[in-house]
Amino acid sequence: MAYKPEHVVDLESGAVVSAVIHPADRGDTTTLATTLDDAQAKLCAVRDREGAPGIDEPFALVADKGYHSRKVLKDLPDACTSRISEPGHKGRLRWHGDTAARDAVYGNRGRLKSEKGKALMRARGERVERSFAHCLDRGGMRRVHLRGLANVEKRYIIHVAGFNLGILLRALFGFGTPRGWADAPAALLFARIGNLSLLILVIWLPNAADTPDCVMMVISRWHN
């Protein structure tokens, strides 16, 4: 069986908001609504606690040309301003009285040509494609030995959670991958508190002021 993952990515942080697995025989234009609904559900789940924005608030939808269609552009929510790459056309476009589709297509085309639209498309190429490269190529998720879409999706979501955790660690400590942590200066310390012995890993992290901070993690403990 073949499946295709779709990511909803925050272009500011690069974090994956939603990752949905679809059957590979479904086109991008038919799966976009399901993926956006999943992103909305996840944002609503954390909105009250974390103050996360909801999908009903104004947002920009940036996508490649595979998601471009008249129906997709017409059916987008009012809060959405689309910037979806437009495939090439032969000849003139004919609307047959469908003014809503005409306005949606021309509005999307105009936003793509703006400086903001060009900047968002560059960010899409960097951050969205990076999430796929980390999960599918570097992460080895191009091929999985699992049966059923539900099992594949659960495995993939765990992988995406690890990708998001790397972004969080990089923001907090400056290192987000095992290779990055391996390059950090570190030391192992042995400490004894009463009858409790601790093995502590200390990692020195550079900050903007060139005065290193340190992070301590207890990696083992035992009672004497």
Spans of model-derived segments:
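Anion-binding and metal-coordination hotspots
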Residues: 1-224
